[in-house]
């Protein structure tokens, strides 16, 4: 995807999406609970499907129930003490944001050297396939995405500007918009706009 950092954006025609966004925009988040069938397996969120492909032990991502609740085995892998398991799982499940659990698990795998290394292009191609599956199969989420029309989409990451100002670090997946400029590479936003365009094309070609 084309780099987005430094791009000029009309703030009146820009839409932020993230796990805590007000409904229905929260459905655009990868953490949102929605069943994804990918490569012969079923996952409770797009984040689960994506992170599973990066894990040396893909089966770890089958240790969640259909709604993303962690099993005791998965809790152990993530490193949650038993007394914190239910609080963590219940909090994110109530918010329909079970994908955060997949993020926690891959972070643990990275610490243990169990995370596969993929190129930027490989990760983007993987996300394209998974996101297309999400929005093709979930008509409600698809409508939310298509209803953004031609708005500039960006995954809001609050720390983007602070990190850039402090040490020049450019956030890869998300961004902020500051004074009409994108601060961060916003690759997830770019992917979402790519998916939106492709879905529109598919719908227009239907008889």
How should these model regions be labeled?
Residues 1-207:
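Charged, low-complexity intrinsically disordered segments
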């Amino acid at each position: 995807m084309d780099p987005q950092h430094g791009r000029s954006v009309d703030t009146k025609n820009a839409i932020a999406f993230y796990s805590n966004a007000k409904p229905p925009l929260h459905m655009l988040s990868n953490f949102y609970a929605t069943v994804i069938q990918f490569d012969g397996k079923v996952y409770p969120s797009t984040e689960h499907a994506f992170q599973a492909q990066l894990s040396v032990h893909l089966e770890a991502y089958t240790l969640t129930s259909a709604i993303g609740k962690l099993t005791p085995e998965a809790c152990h892998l993530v490193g949650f003490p038993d007394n914190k398991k239910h609080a963590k799982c219940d909090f994110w499940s109530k918010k329909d944001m079970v994908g955060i659990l997949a993020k926690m698990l891959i972070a643990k795998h990275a610490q243990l050297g169990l995370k596969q290394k993929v190129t930027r292009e490989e990760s983007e191609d993987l996300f394209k396939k998974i996101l297309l599956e999400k929005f093709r199969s979930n008509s409600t989420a698809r409508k939310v995405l298509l209803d953004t029309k031609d708005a500039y989409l960006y995954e809001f990451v609050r720390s983007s500007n602070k990190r850039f100002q402090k040490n020049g670090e450019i956030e890869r997946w998300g961004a902020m918009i500051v004074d009409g400029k994108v601060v961060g590479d916003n690759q997830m936003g770019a992917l979402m706009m790519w998916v939106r365009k492709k879905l529109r094309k598919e719908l227009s070609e239907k008889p």
